[in-house]
């Protein structure tokens, strides 16, 4: 009698450089670079240019940015379902189309309502290319090397701050806002569409459970064993799940708040040019931190790594508030950046290690959504505290308190039993 084992493919060698999953990782790197480049690091550029062109208030434009973050968070919750129903290639192509359309349309808006509409389109694109989508897609190709693949792919997020945003600034100065935005969207489409079409294919057949359901319609590992064993409601009612989602939501609120206010805080002390260089240094160090985590992942206690990362960021922020010395500020930004990228990667890595495998995709999407819902309010909250107190001391003290609380929570709430079954 024929058994399922008769149809199983040979064991997948994820360590081989020829393994197709590494090409998928490269595509995810570029996806992350454009997603974060246009969807996070360039929002300050959009704000400055729209104010220059139309004289719109900061609160009006910031309101559109907050709406963008909140809608993205709402959609990320369901990204694992979208990948199952549509497949990774279609999801990434949909994201590229929406993000590219939004970047292009920003060049032609003339009214505030159009800005909000464009940001809603951008949110759809961002959700389909964000960390939840990338970790779910990589979960289809990787099991043992999933942590390394995620760390490598999400280095693209930091690269968006190093390459995409600065290039956009130069292009706007040379050609104007409209031409630069259309050109940037064209370049993104020219790179991503063929790369996704050629290299994002069906994942390999596996005899083991990877924790991410394969797309429907293909003869892949989409058996009943890969259906999530718990629901989103059960996850939200679980203290074990919140021991991951809660601390990282607080940590990212502080981190994203600092990102948005970094130049405004540093410019009076070291000038605009050097303040801009601290952004490049921070994002470069984020890449170094991710690579270091990726190569040593299997030997590390990830919750302890998270706690130490948050303590180092808190110390860096404290140092920044106590000096105007340029060298000290650069060193503090480098220390802060060393952990910045890992705080995006670590939730998925902890979930993979601690929770039952079949719920990986759903739990990562839900955790990502909670984090984004929370950090959407970070920049505004810091702005309110700064305006109320007349400086950034109290605002950064709030960030430090959030980071210390997150460090304590993630370390003290570690589960006793693994893998965790939430049902």
Please place each PLM-identified region on the residue numbering.
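Extracytoplasmic
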Residues: 23-58, 76-79, 165, 257-263
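Extracytoplasmic gate region of multi-pass secondary transporters
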Residues: 43-47, 236-288
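Intracellular juxtamembrane helix-capping segments at the cytosolic ends
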Residues: 50, 128-142, 342-355
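Helix-to-loop junctions at the C-terminal end of transmembrane segments
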Residues: 75-88, 290-301, 386
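C-terminal ends and interior cores of transmembrane alpha-helices
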Residues: 97-110, 312-324
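Cytoplasmic helix-loop-helix junction between adjacent transmembrane helices
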Residues: 120-155
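Helix-loop-helix hairpin linking two adjacent transmembrane segments in secondary transporters
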Residues: 157-204
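C-terminal transmembrane helical hairpin of 12-TM major facilitator-type secondary transporters
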Residues: 282-286, 292, 299-350
């Amino acid at each position: 009698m024929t058994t399922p084992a008769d149809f199983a493919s040979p064991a997948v060698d994820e360590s081989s450089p020829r393994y197709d999953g590494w090409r998928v990782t490269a595509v995810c790197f570029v996806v992350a670079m454009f997603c974060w480049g246009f969807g996070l690091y360039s929002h300050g550029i959009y704000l400055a240019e729209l104010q220059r062109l139309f004289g719109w208030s900061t609160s009006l434009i910031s309101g559109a940015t907050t709406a963008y973050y909140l809608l993205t968070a709402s959609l990320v919750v369901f990204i694992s379902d979208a990948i199952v129903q549509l497949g990774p290639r279609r999801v990434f192509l949909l994201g590229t189309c929406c993000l590219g359309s939004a970047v292009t349309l920003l060049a032609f808006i003339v009214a505030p309502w159009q800005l909000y509409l464009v940001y809603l389109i951008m949110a759809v694109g961002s959700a389909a290319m964000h960390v939840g989508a990338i970790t779910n897609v990589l979960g289809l190709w990787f099991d043992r090397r999933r942590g390394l693949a995620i760390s490598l792919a999400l280095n693209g997020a930091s690269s968006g701050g190093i390459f995409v945003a600065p290039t956009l600034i130069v292009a706007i100065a040379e050609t104007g806002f409209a031409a630069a935005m259309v050109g940037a969207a064209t370049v993104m489409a020219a790179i991503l569409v063929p790369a996704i079409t050629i290299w994002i294919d069906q994942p390999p057949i596996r005899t083991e459970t990877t924790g991410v359901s394969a797309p429907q319609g293909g003869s892949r590992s989409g058996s009943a064993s890969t259906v999530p064993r718990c629901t989103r409601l059960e996850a939200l009612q679980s203290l074990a799940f919140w021991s991951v989602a809660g601390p990282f939501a607080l940590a990212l609120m502080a981190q994203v708040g600092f990102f948005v206010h970094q130049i405004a805080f540093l410019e009076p002390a070291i000038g605009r040019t050097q303040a801009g260089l601290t952004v490049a240094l921070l994002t470069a160090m984020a890449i170094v931190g991710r690579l270091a985590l990726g190569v040593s992942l299997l030997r590390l206690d990830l919750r302890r790594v998270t706690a130490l990362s948050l303590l180092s960021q808190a110390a860096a922020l404290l140092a920044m508030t106590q000096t105007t010395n340029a060298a000290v500020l650069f060193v503090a930004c480098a220390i802060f950046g060393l952990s910045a990228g890992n705080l995006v990667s670590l939730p998925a890595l902890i979930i993979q290690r601690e929770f039952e495998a079949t719920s990986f995709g759903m739990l990562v999407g839900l955790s990502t959504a909670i984090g984004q819902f929370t950090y959407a309010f970070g920049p505004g909250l810091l702005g309110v505290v700064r305006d109320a107190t007349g400086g950034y001391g109290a605002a950064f003290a709030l960030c430090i308190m959030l980071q210390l609380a997150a460090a304590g929570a993630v370390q003290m709430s570690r589960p006793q039993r693994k893998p965790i079954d939430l049902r």
